[in-house]
Amino acid sequence: MEELKHCPSTLKEGFSTYSPEACRKLFGGKQVSHILDFDSPNNNSADSTDYAEHIGRISLSGVQPKGALVLRDGSLRKPKEGERGEYILKPAPESYALLERKYCPANEHLTMQMAAQAYGIETAANALCFFRDGEAAYITKRFDVAPDGSKYPQEDFASLAGLTKANGGTNYKYGVLSYEDCADIIRRYVRAAQVDLLRFFRVVLFNYITLNDDAHLKNFSLIDRGNGDYRLAPAYDLINTSLHLRTPQIFALEKGLFKEGMRMTDTHTVDRTDFEEFGRRIGLPDRMVKREVDTFAKVSLLALGLIERSFLSEELKKSYRQSYQYRCFTLK
């Protein structure tokens, strides 16, 4: 593979591997290679097939496989039997239904970095890494694993709402609740609810301007990091889905922002007034709502720089940039 010109985590210029800042956030300060010692699961080698079918498989959400990695002796490797994965590995999906599927890891990485760097949203630490055959994969550090290896209690919003396929149907992650209902979940379970309602509001706004229509109930969760209080977990699974889906939606949740649903037509989709009403409904002060909508209505030069330095193709960079700028404009 070609030598890198940007840190594959922070996207800072002048680095051919992970920068010191990235190593601190992801690896406890250890210098770690960005190249894995095995091939992509999309490669037909026996080694990659064994990994995909037998080692470290966590789940399959939609069409995107997830695997596990551990950090040992300065390298990321597959976990042995009985080892708890410290990192989640997401290679490019194999589904031919997706457009430009090999760039899914770069898309998720860019979107997560935009959230953290340009908008100050707390996110799971993340980066790109590369298989031995050169294919990129997305890696994120598990925030539900304590330093001693134990697991912090964590519940996604579908579980907290008591929704399953049995009582909510096969579309239960998307078709039952609204984002206003999600705010009620925060209010019910989080002691410092007002703080997390603001954090939630900002993530919903960010998902809108970055065209993430896969922010379903399992992509929000509450976590207790050992002090007995649940709080909104760091943002995860942020991605501009419009780059890969043939018929993208505006919101993942079919009801949209409001409990009664949203009537969207060819002449009215979503604008600033909808988010202002949403902010008020979930209990945020008007001045705070205005401040946040103003923030997300303004195109971030830092975000544009991240798009330009990302590992997307030039064509996808252009599409991402244009769609992001347009969504910001709709909030003015």
Language model region names:
Residues 1-47, 53, 188, 230-232, ...:
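Regulatory N- and C-terminal appendages and interdomain linkers associated
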Residues 125, 282-295:
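Short, surface-exposed acidic
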Residues 69, 115, 157, 214, ...:
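A residue-level signal for conserved active-site and pocket-lining positions in enzyme catalytic cores
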Residues 102-119, 175-246:
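Conserved kinase catalytic-core segment
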Residues 131, 291-301:
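Small/polar glycine-rich anion-binding or flexible loop at a beta-alpha turn
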Residues 46-169:
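Conserved ATP-binding subdomain of kinase catalytic cores across diverse folds
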Residues 132, 136-209, 265, 274, ...:
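ATP-dependent phospho-/nucleotidyl transfer catalytic cores
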